[in-house]
């Protein structure tokens, strides 16, 4: 295992560092301290490096990136309806950065922080450990929240991402990494990328992408990924009902042993399995690297955001995102690469 550190540049008059984790197979994970960003997850196949995610080549591409490209989201990923919620008898008002709702932790959330970083290394793992304390003055959420995000690469080509947090007052905590995958050979589009999900329901969303509270079966619809299916095939079925994209929350079965989702290429070269200890997966089609193609919905990236179901604070059956005062919590997301 090897860990290197280099200067990535400067944002907001802060020096941003880049950490690269490399195992003996040549698999690399690069992390930027700005936004706790996963800049690279790549593997070596037959002597050629192949990226598994969609990325930007330099720091400038991650400065207020509208896609939150492979960046940390928090304190709460997804949207909070009305930019407010009730907690311990008090109404908490957040900044409505997506009027009239709050989105992805707000304009001063995890994405817009330059995290402190250290590293850890063992015989078969390499880690970068990112820490930050969020205050109510920063993001309007209650409590001073101490958060640690740890990226760990193993010799088995598994990337574990852990989120550890503790607050001095009750608050909300539902973080994720907004990772955009494309595991196909040339990463040009999603025509040859298939997806399989562990669940058979999705949330009904309104026009602002706020959950209505209803869960509906996916069987037989364009949202049915109970068996491996290309993104293109699913989109083609959605088009028949006037839909043009995936920007949806799926109900999945949390598990450390069974993937909540698997992504592969139809040539059979590679797969990535996603594991999570939470019950939601937001799936989003995009093209973060080509605005012209994005305008005509020519997608080359599939965001897979593992989290508790969005807007859970307003829906008791979606899961518990309340973090009581002085109580530690940990969540884990894992990506397992397999050469086929």
Curated annotation (Swiss-Prot):
EC number(s) given by UniProt: 5.1.3.21
InterPro entries the record matches: Aldose_1-epimerase, Aldose_1/G6P_1-epimerase, Gal_mutarotase_sf_dom, Galactose_mutarotase-like, GH-type_carb-bd
Example of a GO cellular component annotation carried by this entry: cytoplasm
UniProt keyword terms in alphabetical order: Carbohydrate metabolism, Isomerase
Catalytic activity: alpha-maltose = beta-maltose
Source organism superkingdom: Bacteria
CDD domains: galactose_mutarotase_like
GO biological process: galactose catabolic process via UDP-galactose, Leloir pathway; glucose metabolic process
Pathway assigned in UniProt: Carbohydrate metabolism; hexose metabolism
Uses in biotechnology: Available as a commercial product from Sigma Aldrich (catalog number M0902).
Function field: Catalyzes the interconversion of alpha and beta anomers of maltose.
Family: Belongs to the aldose epimerase family.
Name of the protein in question: Maltose epimerase
